[in-house]
């Protein structure tokens, strides 16, 4: 039995964020994008934005523990092109939890 668990842990797919590019946002207009975590074998314990690579002012990422998705929503306040890092991890079971991260560029226009 232990051998089967070890084989499964070693061969399971790595989770990844299904959204590869964020759509263009507009100042003063509501914005919402669902970010799914693909290939997660367990629930997602956290999905966050790195403080060093934040979302534009007015946008935030929300996530409920165990959900395999998060949502970026809000209303952007300033134009620009922003580098954003979204990262997270899955819960562990017999196998250790797995990490996921994705760099994005988000453009905010008038």
What residue ranges belong to the model's regions?
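Solvent-exposed, low-complexity, repeat-rich "mucin-like" stalks and linkers
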Residues: 1-8, 15-46, 104-109
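An extracellular/luminal cadherin ectodomain-centered signature
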Residues: 13, 45-50, 72-74
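Beta-strand-rich interaction surfaces with strong enrichment in secreted/lumenal proteins
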Residues: 21-23, 60-62, 73
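Low-complexity "stalk/linker" and mucin-like segments enriched in Ser/Thr/Pro/Ala/Gly
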Residues: 52-70
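Well-ordered beta-strand positions in beta-sheet-rich domains
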Residues: 71, 101-105
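Extracellular/luminal low-complexity segments enriched in Ser/Thr/Pro
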Residues: 71-81
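Short, solvent-exposed loop/turn segments at the edges of extracellular beta-sandwich modules
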Residues: 90-96
């Amino acid at each position: 039995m232990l051998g089967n668990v070890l084989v499964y842990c070693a061969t399971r797919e790595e989770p990844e964020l299904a959204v590869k590019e964020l759509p263009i946002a507009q100042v003063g207009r509501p914005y919402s994008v669902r970010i799914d975590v693909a290939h997660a074998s367990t629930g997602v314990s956290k999905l966050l934005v790195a403080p060093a690579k934040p979302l534009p002012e007015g946008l935030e990422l929300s996530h409920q523990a165990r959900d395999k998705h998060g949502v970026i929503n809000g209303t952007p306040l300033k134009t620009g092109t922003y580098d954003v890092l979204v990262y997270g991890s899955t819960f562990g079971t017999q196998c250790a939890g797995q990490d996921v991260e994705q760099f994005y560029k988000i453009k905010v226009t008038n």
